[in-house]
Amino acid sequence: MVELSFSQLLVLLLSLLFLFTTLASSSKTPRFKYSLEKPHHPLDPLTTPEIKRVQTILSGHDPGFGSGSTIIHAMALDEPDKQRVIRWKKGDRLPPRRAEILAMSNGESHVLTVDLKSGRVVSDLVNPTFGYPILTMKDIIAVSQVPYKSVEFNRSIEARGIPFSGLICITPFAGWYGPDEEGRRVIKIQCFSKQDTVNFYMRPIEGLYLTVDMDKLEIIKIVDNGPVPVPKSTGTEYRYGFLNETVYMDRVNPMSMEQPDGPSFQVEDGYLVKWANWKFHIKPDQRAGMIISQATVRDSKTGEARSVMYKGFASELFVPNMDPGEGWYSKAYMDAGEFGLGPSSMPLVPLNDCPRNAYYIDGFFASPEGIPILQPNMICLFERYAGDTSWRHSEILLPGVDIRESRAKVTLVARMACSVGNYDYIFDWEFQMDGVIRVTVAASGMLMVKGTAYENVEDLGEKEDDSGPLISENVIGVVHDHFISFHLDMDIDGSANNSFVKVHLEKQRLPPGESRRKSYLKVKKYVAKTEKDAQIKMSLYDPYEFHLVNPNRLSRLGNPAGYKLVPGGNAASLLDHDDPPQMRGAFTNNQIWVTRYNRSEQWAGGLLMYQSRGEDTLQVWSDRDRSIENKDIVLWYTLGFHHVPCQEDFPVMPTIASSFELKPVNFFESNPVLGISPFFEKDLPVC
């Protein structure tokens, strides 16, 4: 029998994944086939030839890249200088192409910059900050095999009566909890039973936890608090073809939005999107999942293309679980910085994730060995019409005049979904013809649950578990938070001269006898001078609007052109600031931040997130208190929600969503969608 090495097994697994995902995507699905062998825009992601060239250059720089002792953890375009990108026009020569690589070699973190034209490594920073790069699939697969090498672990499993054939140990978590965990990459894992179910997340093997040295692949510590009943597999199935339950619900007929003339948007050169009055660049990203760049909107009155946002993306996704017990205290995930939203993305499912007439974009990332890996159907673009109204008015006070004006609201959605372990997240960037950009994050998938001996709340008595409610027999849904920090480099009619304005709604009391009213609201505006002026904690009883304006671009009435942030889901972190997870997730100390533009400040939790200590976070940058008035500035908003689980979240959660908007404020001279055409029956298909 031929024995395969771990590396051969990994390559085989990746090859099978490639084959599966390629076959899973419909041949009729409009998609970008990656036939391009060269980039067309300064912000285009690395092409497959470029990824291969980077691997060749790195092998020459460090023989370890060829032997496998040096591992690539992330590779992406090192974007050109912002002003150079802004000045670039189609037909111009592209700026020099560079790649940024996060790698590990001999236990040290490397941040390398490679010049693709010269073939040189122009920078190699070793351990620039405390922490390690994003995990690789190779890391996760290797760690999942470590428990079986331990006699102590195997005895613990046997004592619990769990068959090894039904065992799976693939949910890693780390964090940072003191100096005893420093100096090496540490990971903590818990195992589950997949016997009689694919939903192993609902069958945790509670009370048994392992700490592993990732580089030596050795167990550092085993904690065995004694057996806890493993929840039964009954009721854990969620796949449509395997559900045997009777559903007492009237069938809803299939539906889709028909477009007889095809979609209204265009995708040029793979990544440049044009729709209605919008134009923007979109690309897959290993860490952020999806990046929107150079979003411009055309003024419907003048035809001028005006800049709105240079770059927007999900910077970090922080999920702290609220159980301080052994084995649980470190389950506080930084999904973007520790796992990556790009590699966690799975192919979007046509007709269910994205509607008919959607257009799909693939992603390409580098494997630990520097080999291009395909992420098919990673992003989809589609037009949405859900029966909403863009604007309307009917008039009844003019005799003999029949006025019933209404316009349908059609939007363009860019969507990416990722499955980061048990949780699934759907990210939407939705562009509206009135200039609004709405960003929505939806969550589904499986809860992170805890095993318990109790099957009914009556069994608990006064021993109710503080970590969460009972959601099924022997299953506790652990309370947790979701915080998604967005990096929003807003460039309102230019990049070098924006300001952040806090518009305060202040209650004014009237003296007796002046009016029959006793109070009213008055608006006062405050221009933030420095970064600390723009550290905002939301409060319902101290309301503000938050505007980004260009004081040098005035409307005909003298108002500065601007956009405002319309917050949606707001939740404050209740953790102490010196709690280790909160130190790393310090960007949740406020809901809104504004910083001076710095191309190195992109990741709210820091560049090297894994086992970081909170020394390179948005909080640290903002506390430098740089001037932000009439400067190139970046808006940061953290969308958040607390999640107290319930029975409806079992075995898989119905999708919950939260959003925020970026909305024009005196940006246009009047309603920009006044002149859009209504729909008429004659223009629609008869189905």
Swiss-Prot record:
It is an enzyme of class 1 (oxidoreductase). It comes from the Eukaryota. The active site is at D335, Y423. Mn(2+) binds at D489, M490, D491, D632, I633. Glycans are attached at N154, N244, N497, N598. Keywords: Apoplast, Copper, Disulfide bond, Glycoprotein, Manganese, Metal-binding, Oxidoreductase, Secreted, Signal, TPQ. Pfam families: Cu_amine_oxid (PF01179), Cu_amine_oxidN2 (PF02727), Cu_amine_oxidN3 (PF02728). GO terms for molecular function: copper ion binding; primary methylamine oxidase activity; quinone binding. Induction: Induced transiently by auxin (IAA). Induced during wounding, dehydration recovery, and treatment with putrescine (Put). Slightly and transiently repressed by jasmonic acid (MeJA), abscisic acid (ABA) and salicylic acid (SA), and drought. Expressed in roots, leaves and cotyledons. GO terms for biological process: putrescine catabolic process; response to abscisic acid; response to auxin; response to jasmonic acid; response to putrescine; response to salicylic acid; response to water deprivation; response to wounding. Its cofactor is Cu cation; Zn(2+); L-topaquinone; Mn(2+). Disulfide bonds join C169-C191, C354-C380. Residues 1-24 form the signal peptide. Its EC number is 1.4.3.21. Pathway: Amine and polyamine degradation; putrescine degradation. Homodimer. Belongs to the copper/topaquinone oxidase family. Copper amine oxidase that can use putrescine and spermidine as substrates. This is Amine oxidase [copper-containing] gamma 2.
